[in-house]
Amino acid sequence: MNQRERKKRTVKAETAAKTALTAKEIKTEKTVSAVKEKKAVKPDTQGIFDNRMAEKIDELRWLYMELYGNDSMFAELCGQLQAFYQERTDALKNLDLKREADPDWYKKNDMLGMMFYIDNFAGNIKGVSAKLPYLKECNVNCLHLMPFLDTPKGRSDGGYAVADFRKVRPDLGSMKDLAALADKCHKNGMNLCMDFVMNHTSEDHEWARKARQGDGEYMSRYFFYNNREIPDEYEKTVPQVFPTTAPGNFTWLPDIGHYVMTTFYPYQWDLNYGNPRVFNEMMYNFLFLANQ
């Protein structure tokens, strides 16, 4: 090998070594950057919760005590607020921070919403997910899903007679499908909204079934009366929602010998928010859904 060939090969080897080193440096930089980025987006969950609670606790306690004056139920609520927050995904926690920094995010003039029943629009939740590119093309960035939770067939009032607040109507999908849709929406800069029915439950709800069996704990979650005295007083001032199809605001239950308040349809029993257990449990249902 002559000197020229040796020099040429040496230069080639040095160039290859530099290229390999550069590639390694780039790879290392990308790895470090990815680690930093991952750390940056993982929120300090306990610290964030503690700060928010410290800021709001006095107002929250005052409002709760004005309504119920029950320390133990308030303590339970605070504990559950923390538990549900810890169960939120990092993606949702970061979305919380983003919205907290821009409290008027939902008032922007580019907010364009669309409301629909899932089955009428796309068949099921996965169908809605498949249509997101089309909706995004239409500049829709807020999806308002009409009631989709589990309801008794034939007695659903369009989905407003909820039998289970933690179960999607089977023909529409599952909670896993809902969480996947929410995640896909957020990744596309879209918001997901739902109707949360808090005034009443279906008579098929677990609470209503137990109340109908005479369980006092669950009867206290609704408005039960064994005669017409108080119902008649209500009827003097409470307007009727469906005066033609469902007249009156109370339904007689001959199997237990009581009237129950039903301001909508007879199969929708009004919840008694004078009972702190009702407020707490409905809030837990709300938080469960917000975590999807």
Pin down the residues of each PLM region:
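Acidic/aromatic-lined carbohydrate-recognition and catalytic surfaces
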Residues: N2-K12, K24-N280, L287
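Active-site groove signature of glycoside hydrolases
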Residues: L289-Q292
